[in-house]
């Protein structure tokens, strides 16, 4: 199992794709999601609940445009959104955190920088 992350309330842990980690205090007057998007240089965020196994409210904000996708239609009612090309470097640490909460055998990787914060700190 991977080393769990520890994040203080009212802070954002940024994990860069190169492996560096930085803790940034949340700014008053700036929504935490907006601050996270700026910190990880993302136009659109997606959130992964990574604290479920430890019973915390930690969420990981990832760049929703970090992958190029294709839509595969299996039948009239079943479509698949398939990642085909990374637009940013693989973030090994974020991928490990993601795989810890996924079903065994998951191979999808997290790309680019990520921001981790407490969901309760996001209004």
Regions found by a protein language model. Give the residues of each.
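Short beta-rich binding modules
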Residues: 1-123
């Amino acid at each position: 199992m991977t080393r769990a992350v520890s994040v203080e309330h009212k802070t954002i842990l940024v994990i860069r794709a190169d492996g560096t980690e930085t803790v940034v205090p949340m700014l008053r007057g700036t929504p935490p999601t907006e601050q996270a998007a700026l910190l990880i240089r993302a136009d659109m965020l997606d959130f992964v609940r990574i604290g479920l196994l430890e019973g915390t409210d930690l969420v990981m904000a990832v760049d929703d445009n970090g992958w190029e996708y294709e839509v595969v239609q299996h039948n009239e009612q079943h479509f698949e959104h398939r990642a085909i090309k990374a637009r940013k470097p693989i973030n090994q640490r974020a991928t490990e955190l993601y795989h810890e909460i996924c079903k065994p055998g998951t191979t999808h990787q997290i790309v680019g920088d990520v921001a981790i914060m407490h969901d309760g700190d996001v209004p």
